[in-house]
Amino acid sequence: MSIKSKLLGAVAGTTLALGAQAALAGGHSEITVAYFLEWPMPFEYAKQMGTYDEELGVKVNWVSFESGVKMSAAMASGDVHLSVSQGVPPFVVAASAGQDLQILDVAVSYADNDNCVVRSDLEIDKDSTAELAGKKVAVPLGTAAHYGFLKQMSHFGVDVGSMEVVDMDPPDGAAAISQGAVDMFCGWGGSLRRAKEH
């Protein structure tokens, strides 16, 4: 294991422990932590080994989510006490809407993990982006992928108002583009890799 990996693991573990201590200070005998399956992180080793339960002295329930937006909703309902890898855009959207959230740490960049894909049979490339007008796009609203989509359309001069934007989690969006139900997909991880096949 490299020094960088060890350092990232220590930072992630410390951050998670600090957040858990805050939840415990609220009188919880167990805590529920939301995490995002698409971005494996160093904390997952300690999760699998039961280290957090042991060190905190309480049961830690782990719940996976497909998007940071859903993590925010679970935190708002009280079902989740702490979110790991929620994403900055979902945090900002939730906090702007009045949700009482606090950032403990920002650990990663999403630059290489999310993007948009246009169905290959449409033969739209960077020189013909005007043809995206009127097209249907699947994008998980309020996420890093949504932010990236808006920035890309702005860069290419495409009016998002001329498109049919459908709020879809990445697995659903990848399935929709593979079936021809949408013309464009924006997402991340395995769903993005699957969407690139179409």
Predicted regions and their residues:
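Bacterial N-terminal signal peptides that target proteins for export
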Residues: 1-11
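Sec/Tat signal peptide C-region and signal peptidase I cleavage site
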Residues: 18-25
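Short, glycine-/small- and polar/acidic-enriched structural segments
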Residues: 26-158, 164-169, 183-190
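Conserved, function-defining micro-sites of small-solute handling proteins
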Residues: 175, 179, 185-186
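Phosphate/pyrophosphate-binding betaalpha-module
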Residues: 193
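Extracytoplasmic/periplasmic substrate-binding proteins
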Residues: 196-198
